């Protein structure tokens, strides 16, 4: 079974939830017998052609533009796939690329779409762009042979909105990474950040408005917390928002840029708490990473975060700086206890890979 993945920036170690999803999923599918090729975007990967754990990666030119990048690259990637790769299935990631589901079908390829979240709710998009993304969702549901959705609530909503296509819409979540579970010494904390274990609050993600980091910084400043706030992440395209956010840096508000490997694992494991103040998510991989590392979490009360089913104290009203500030001030008084083993079983990448491979296999006929 030959699969061509389109819609992600690339793998491995490219910033983004979709990219993390694909980096975990496809090597496991290769072990199950799939032949997987990822068509990556040239600015985010090194080399024209290479392999990562059995997954073939081909770099195709992409314009770096907030709106045009995804659409232009997806269009040419589908044509490239049809002419040079000739896959049995095109696996499109996210509803922007899913706009081209009809094109892939017209070219004779079967299509599976993974819906990573209602991107039309993202703050950065104009009303016109939001309509295009909503239309992309409709094209996915209408023309794809199978639609996988990472959020349980979103799966139910799509089945209700498109009852005629409900049978081909399936819930398949993101997974947790077992590599974050083993204990790691605080000596792996980035030395230049001068952090003390259990004396900092952590957040991880791209510096874009829908992640809500501006709320977190404001809430932290308003709180009486004696901890530090560490923000791990960067942005693909520098913007007024990211520049303004970085201006809030102080001795206690630290922008740590991108981190990975043992550094990121140590940052999760030795944090007092992990906070995700997002306005928009699919199923937040960074929250699952924090839980797998044994770090207490505070999450905004948007549906994808509620789907994680953490204790009540773990949630705060999205956009409510005052309520978040109160929680940051009283972390020791909150019940943030999670049964990590339950989550590791529920969000196991091996099982998720098997389920995804089963849906792929079902499209062979």
Model-derived features with residue positions:
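A conserved mid-protein helix/loop that constitutes part of the nucleotide-sugar donor-binding site
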Residues: 20, 199-222
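An aromatic- and histidine-rich active-site surface loop
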Residues: 69-83, 87-115
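Donor nucleotide-sugar binding/catalytic pocket of nucleotide-sugar-dependent glycosyltransferases
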Residues: 134-183, 195-198, 203
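Aromatic "clamp/platform" in nucleotide-sugar-dependent glycosyltransferases that forms part
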Residues: 279
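Conserved acidic donor-binding segment of nucleotide-sugar-dependent glycosyltransferases
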Residues: 313-322, 328-333
């Amino acid at each position: 079974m030959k699969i061509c993945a389109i819609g992600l920036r690339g793998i491995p170690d490219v910033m983004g939830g979709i990219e993390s999803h694909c980096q975990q999923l496809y090597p496991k599918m290769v072990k199950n017998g799939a032949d997987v090729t990822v068509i990556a975007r040239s600015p985010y990967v090194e080399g024209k052609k290479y392999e990562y754990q059995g997954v073939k990666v081909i770099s195709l030119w992409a314009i770096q533009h907030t709106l045009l990048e995804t659409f232009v690259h997806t269009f040419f990637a589908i044509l490239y796939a049809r002419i040079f790769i000739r896959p049995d299935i095109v696996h499109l990631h996210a509803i922007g690329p899913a706009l081209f589901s009809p094109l892939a079908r017209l070219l004779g390829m079967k299509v599976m779409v993974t819906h990573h979240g209602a991107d039309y709710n993202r703050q950065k998009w104009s009303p016109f762009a939001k309509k295009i993304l909503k239309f992309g969702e409709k094209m996915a549901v209408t023309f794809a042979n199978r639609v996988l959705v990472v959020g349980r609530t979103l799966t139910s909503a799509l089945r209700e909105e498109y009852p005629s296509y409900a049978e081909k819409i399936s819930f398949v979540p993101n997974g947790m990474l077992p590599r974050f579970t083993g204990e790691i010494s605080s000596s792996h904390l980035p030395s230049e950040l001068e952090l003390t274990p259990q004396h900092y609050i952590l957040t991880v993600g791209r510096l874009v408005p829908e992640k809500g980091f501006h709320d977190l910084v404001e809430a932290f400043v308003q709180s009486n917390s004696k901890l530090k706030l560490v923000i791990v992440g960067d942005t693909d395209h520098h913007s007024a928002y990211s520049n303004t956010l970085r201006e809030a840096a102080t001795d206690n508000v630290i922008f740590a840029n991108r981190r990975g490997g043992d550094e990121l694992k140590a940052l999760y494991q030795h944090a007092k708490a992990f906070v995700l103040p997002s306005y928009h998510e699919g199923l937040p991989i960074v929250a699952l990473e924090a839980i797998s590392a044994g770090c207490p979490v505070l999450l905004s009360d948007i549906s994808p975060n509620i789907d994680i089913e953490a204790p009540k104290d773990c949630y705060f009203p999205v956009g409510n700086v005052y309520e978040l500030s109160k929680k940051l001030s009283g972390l020791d008084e909150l019940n943030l206890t999670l049964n990590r083993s339950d989550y590791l079983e529920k969000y196991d990448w091996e099982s998720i890979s098997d389920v995804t491979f089963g849906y792929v296999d079902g499209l062979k006929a």
